[in-house]
């Protein structure tokens, strides 16, 4: 007993001694601060060398763009981690985004156990603890986040480590307010200068690689391809089922490319008939046709110097394909009704959900255009092939929906498990629609299994197609969810508890669905 107590005291004294030394050195670093970025990096070095806190990270919040950017990151072997300075978080996103949104410290005994852990840096040790604390600014509002990993997994030390980091965060926040905030605050927000962009240009916020959700091998590979292809003007063909996020990929490529400051213009090739396509893409001169009362630039001119995203390219006609091929080959075009040849410098990103090789074989798609577009193909996997991403996607989308609805939303683990049992024929778009519908139905703000409704009749979740009843042959797989519920109730003699057992659900779930699906219960 006495030996154990002495040992514990020694450890505590060692911790306090190291923390005092580290705090003293951090105070010296901050007192001599002249350059914010360099100063913050020095603070993280002290945390690593003197306080045994590895992978330190300091993020600062830009309230105008509503993003949390990495300002300093503990370097490995004195080398900057690739892409780390481009990674950003929104309030409520990931662990650091959660700390910013809540303004409270977050302590995890094992970082990988928390489903909010995004691991975008591919840096952290999954088995070690993780601590993130807010940098508090004026009026008790967070202006950033300090995060680090203790080098040892000693849970009894976590409270002391957290208090230490909170003290360091207070010192950092005070220095940042003195060095950075007065400059940006000198001008009222409403008077801040605005940079006018072309109307066709989409804001880059929300389209960086940091906003692509998914840690599956397939998504990691796609992110690597985007990083590589973004640097060049190579034509890209994005392929994937409807709802997989092809436009998001195109946006990410553009906004991470040297053309990011120019326009990103999108055009759906299936949205207009042939007689309007040419005018829409190439523009027209005044009087070129009835109703052409003025000259109008087409999408190619609007995208000059930037990127043109041609969605649903597989739906285009032979006539359209011929005109498109010419401009891809020569970089030249004329407006409808004009004779002046215009040169444009445009990067093309096309997208399709069709099997273009088969379309070429059938003569529906030009072979020469296919080879022009298919320089760098990117194939997006359907959501059913990356189920490990569903939980992260669900949390991401719930935060997005909560922001749009102006309220707090949460999703339960049970609801996540139910989502993972569904094969999502509509992919991410269907998942987002499902969660938005569930949020509307949830009065408490908790999205639980009870409020999740699927709308694809050919693809019921396993909870509605359990193996037991299916063996009896009573459940017709062609029925939609409402029809399945009625069939189960009829088989159970309209006893809700029995119907719930048949469907692998709880009686509460059955009762809720009866109400929202407007099923009339017979009087027994």
Curated annotation (Swiss-Prot):
PROSITE patterns to which the protein is assigned, alphabetical: SIGMA54_INTERACT_1, SIGMA54_INTERACT_2, SIGMA54_INTERACT_3, SIGMA54_INTERACT_4
A matching Pfam family: GAF
Renumbered residue ranges of the record's region C-terminal DNA-binding domain: 482-524
Keyword NAD: no
Domain of life: Bacteria
UniProt region (A domain), positions on chain: 1-182
Biological function: Required for activation of most nif operons, which are directly involved in nitrogen fixation.
Record note on quaternary structure: Interacts with sigma-54.
Official protein name in the record: Nif-specific regulatory protein
